[in-house]
Curated annotation (Swiss-Prot):
Keywords: Ribonucleoprotein, Ribosomal protein. The gene is rplS. Signal peptide: none annotated. HAMAP family: Ribosomal_bL19 (MF_00402). It holds the Pfam family Ribosomal_L19. This protein is located at the 30S-50S ribosomal subunit interface and may play a role in the structure and function of the aminoacyl-tRNA binding site. One of its GO terms (biological process) is translation. It comes from Polynucleobacter necessarius subsp. necessarius (strain STIR1). This is Large ribosomal subunit protein bL19. One of its GO terms (molecular function) is structural constituent of ribosome.
């Protein structure tokens, strides 16, 4: 491991120590709370949409969230370890077969929907079934 990789690893550890990001994947619907500074006021702004891409590059990791606002598609790229991100909340898990969902840009309406990932049912064990 060279010096740059070591420094990046330490920086990632320092930035993620005070903030816990949930694990999410492309297809998931997330709410990203962003700290916005307007003049002297500081407030939190929520951006809810579908994760269409995720880029894992250590300190340079990022993800793209897409939403439809007043009939217009809006995409926003967030740096994963940015201090401007207050929190990330996963609303629903999407069941997709691709890592990059750029094809959603060309679709609208029902064809742009993403199926929800269902949790696997746990089979009861023989001991529990015997009772």
């Amino acid at each position: 491991m060279n010096l740059i990789e070591k420094i990046e690893q330490e920086e990632v550890a320092r930035l993620s120590a005070n903030k816990v990001l949930p694990s999410f994947a492309p297809g998931d619907t997330v709410v990203v709370s962003v700290n916005v500074v307007e003049g002297t006021r500081k407030r939190t702004q929520a951006f809810e949409g579908v994760v269409i891409a995720k880029r894992n590059r250590g300190l340079n990791s990022s993800f793209i969230v897409r939403k439809i606002s007043s009939g217009e598609g809006v995409e926003r790229t967030f740096q994963t370890y940015s201090p401007l991100i207050a929190s990330v909340e996963v609303k629903r898990r999407g069941d997709v077969r691709r890592a990059k969902l750029y094809y959603l840009r060309d679709r609208s309406g029902k064809s742009a929907r993403i199926k929800e990932k269902l949790q696997a049912r746990v089979k009861p064990t023989a001991a529990v079934a015997a009772e």
